Regions:
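Intrinsic-disorder/low-complexity signal
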Residues: 2, 6-154
Length: 154
């Protein structure tokens, strides 16, 4: 991905394309794949939220699931603490617009009654026109949104 930037406190991981954990979760929840796909996975019942800022300036997230430029949040998990292997997924199935995409993660809700910790580690995978990148980071409940990465499509 051209012009990729990485946020503070975020590690870039080598991508094992044989490891289909994130893809399996997206498929399990009925999520789509496409020209641009950003998926977030974590390992507890807390509610993390994926935020993707499109080149148009629109934000795709739980409160605006579709953008006018074709982006869609098609999987949003753990508003209620239903899964210990959650995933979220934002996708542009086709005709992804040119420009810069910025990706953030927010620790929205700590589900204390489910025995979850106040810190959650996550993995974020971006796929853009066939190029895959993976990032890991962690958030503490109460932190501001962590801007994980940005990338530019020509």
């Amino acid at each position: 991905m051209l012009g990729e930037q990485v946020g503070l406190g975020v590690r870039v991981e080598s991508v094992d394309l044989q490891d289909s954990t994130i893809s399996d979760r997206v498929e399990r929840e009925g999520g789509a794949t496409g020209e641009v796909q950003i998926s977030l996975a974590w390992e507890d019942r807390n509610d993390l939220d994926l935020h993707v800022f499109a080149p148009s300036g629109e934000r795709v997230y739980f409160n605006q699931r579709r953008s006018g430029c074709g982006g869609e949040l098609d999987v949003d998990m753990n508003a209620r603490p239903t899964s210990s292997t959650p995933v979220e997924n934002v996708v542009w199935k086709e005709n992804a617009p040119s420009g810069t995409y910025r990706v953030g993660v927010h620790f929205y809700r700590h589900h204390r009654r489910r025995g979850t910790k106040r810190q959650t580690t996550f993995t974020l995978r971006t796929t853009a026109l066939g190029e895959v990148a993976e990032f890991t980071g962690s958030l503490v409940f109460g932190d501001a949104m962590l801007m994980v990465t940005s990338f530019t499509l020509p």
